[in-house]
Amino acid sequence: MAVLSWDQTGDRLYETGTDQCVLYPMLDTVVDVTKPYDAGVAWNGLTAVNERPSGAEPTALWADNIKYLNLMSAEEFAATIEAYTYPEEFEVCDGSRSVATGITIGQQPRKMFGLSYRTLVGNDQKSNDYGYKIHLVYGCLASPSQKNYQTVNDSPEAITFSWEVSSTPVDVSGFKPTAHLIIDSTKVAAAKLTALKEILYGTAQNDPRLPLPNEVATLVNGN
């Protein structure tokens, strides 16, 4: 029988950082339901993605003078995106529209979008080079955000934009719908991970796109 041990060399894991963010705007007209998103575009200047899941709260039911059971509420995925800038393609997701070259207006309908970003996994031997996780988020909708413009002074700071993002889950065969999928590079075969990244980030022949969970699972589970 195995004896438990703690903090062995190589097992001291941690997570940090966020980078390689990609925006996938929703298509105006979806022809193929398995490919509802437009080509991805790189999101430069990302500083933070703060995941804020909610729900999954118990409601106690009592009967016969005892606690009968707990009913769990549905869980939802939400996040806050923080960045120094954003791709031009995000403007329609943020409620802006162009009325002429160089002129935009706000308070317009907000387009849904998908998102991918990477977080780093480190350990005591390889530091931040141990691995990473790719996060895929579906059915995102950004809420209006505050922008604080201040005078330039002797302590210059760049404005950090921030958006509250809600999500709508998508179907996953054999499971409940989800809006958040995570791929762990330390557990997925290298060849399959490369194939997935070619889909997400594009190749010389194909535009980057956001695959739905069923396609990701089929790719990773396939031979």
What role is predicted for each listed range?
Residues 48-55, 137:
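Membrane-targeting and insertion segments and their boundary/processing signals
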Residues 19-25, 29-32, 46, 115, ...:
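Generic hydrophobic, helix-prone segments enriched in Leu/Val/Ile
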Residues 44-48, 139, 162:
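Extracellular/lumenal ectodomain signal focusing on beta-strand-rich modules
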Residues 1-51:
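Polar/acidic, low-complexity leader/linker segments enriched in S/T/G and N/D
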Residues 144-223:
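Mixed-charge, glycine-accented linear interaction segment located at domain edges/termini
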Residues 51-52, 58-90, 155-170:
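Oligomerization/assembly interface segments of phage tail-like spikes and tubes
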Residues 67-143:
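Structured, beta-strand-rich domain cores
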Residues 3-8, 12, 28-34, 83, ...:
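Short, charge-rich amphipathic segments
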